[in-house]
Amino acid sequence: MTSGFDYIVVGGGSAGCVLAARLSENPSVRVCLIEAGRRDTHPLIHMPVGFAKMTTGPHTWDLLTEPQKHANNRQIPYVQGRILGGGSSINAEVFTRGHPSDFDRWAAEGADGWSFRDVQKYFIRSEGNAVFSGTWHGTNGPLGVSNLAEPNPTSRAFVQSCQEMGLPYNPDFNGASQEGAGIYQMTIRNNRRCSTAVGYLRPALGRKNLTVVTRALVLKIVFNGTRATGVQYIANGTLNTAEASQEIVVTAGAIGTPKLMMLSGVGPAAHLRENGIPVVQDLPGVGENLQDHFGVDIVAELKTDESFDKYRKLHWMLWAGLEYTMFRSGPVASNVVEGGAFWYSDPSSGVPDLQFHFLAEAGAEAGVTSVPKGASGITLNSYVLRPKSRGTVRLRSADPRVNPMVDPNFLGDPADLETSAEGVRLSYEMFSQPSLEKHIRKTCFFSGKQPTMQMYRDYAREHGRTSYHPTCTCKMGRDDMSVVDPRLKVHGLEGIRICDSSVMPSLLGSNTNAATIMISERAADFIQGNA
């Protein structure tokens, strides 16, 4: 079946939902959004606490990294959203933008017009903050942002412990200063998750000029010479072609976008030929430059049941469910990842190079160590904000149904190992401060030992994992390894742009969802001629 549109958006994740909603605001254009996953109807998606159950299962791509030779040759689960809203529907809802210097660095790296001064207004446009306003925040945007009403006592103790070891208290990591410790702001509105599927796409679903196709596997982008003209996909067992008279915008994420580009004949020519794919455009940077935050968790068992682990017990679980159903409050209204900090591995660094996430629970996410059954615990995750290691995304096969080879090359640069080890050391020190130590029975792995830097290095190699922030695989710029120009147009091609975290020239010093949304807001202006 063939159908025609002005714009086709390929991928209904954080970026795609924003772009489809913005483009369809113009009633004179026809917009089609194509998503491989399902609609966001599962109730756990919309409960803030539900993220812990969303890191595995049918709403994610079943990805596994290649063996990580610098991380004990482990294959690491690599969670990516496969649902309307993408990562914004399954992430931990932490709202951080990055340091202003990150965007100034983008501009210096060849992304002309992407300095913080250039992009700040797009952050503000997207944000509907229920607490902050003024120069740094927006209050009328589609993306709901708020403070937690009732942080867990252990989260408050974490913030106090950070202050006891010299970190300043910071009520707003997206304000004038990033450094310090505090309680994160969340993409939560009225105690429910506010994904881009909720904040942007849902209000647009009634528009007659917007078509949303879900559970659709995109096979390739169709080209007429060097002009993108359509998209082939399978839905309900039927082969379909959607044609675009204006543009196709690929928003499939930092793993899905390079995969689709290569399947369509755009990428490193030799690799495409190895897989029997005719070359449309030789772009060696497609799938290169993969950057991600390598997170390392330490876990402690508590003396009491103050953390959210107690809600694993049936009577407490029922009580929490009842409280949320009746009042939209209580533990179900928490994202669990409540506390956070930005700090330095090297005090002489100009900006923080480590980020910490405090979880008022142990083993909340799939694959992370828990505490003995019936006990309560806490988790502290740390990661290097601007790693030097670079990885790749490559085709395993020309079959679109086959997942690509994902090699983040974690710890490939020795400097990343040293900074990761320092993050573990600081995490252990945070657990050792009076405000937290009084709650802790023992710290798993390090209990009864006098840890050394070599122990921290070994621990990072054995227990580190993705922080779900892959970026930069179709980077923006002017150099030979860039894939798109500063207006997100693919080099050497017509009628096609890329708009997602893959276009970032380098990884941000924070979570990446807010910046991905900002990129989409800006892309909408580019396409509509407003910038």
Curated annotation (Swiss-Prot):
Pfam family name, one: GMC_oxred_C
Could you name the active-site residues?
A: 469 (proton acceptor)
Give this protein's Gene Ontology molecular function annotations: flavin adenine dinucleotide binding; oxidoreductase activity, acting on CH-OH group of donors
Covalent S-S links between cysteines: none
Q: Which reaction does it catalyse?
A: L-sorbopyranose + A = 1-dehydro-L-sorbose + AH2
InterPro entries according to UniProt: FAD/NAD-bd_sf, GMC_OxRdtase, GMC_OxRdtase_N, GMC_OxRtase_C
Q: What is its EC number?
A: 1.1.99.32
The lineage's top-level taxon is: Bacteria
Annotated signal peptide: none
Necessary cofactors? FAD
Its keywords, alphabetically, are: FAD, Flavoprotein, Oxidoreductase
In the record, the note on similarity to other proteins reads: Belongs to the GMC oxidoreductase family.
Q: What is this protein called?
A: L-sorbose 1-dehydrogenase
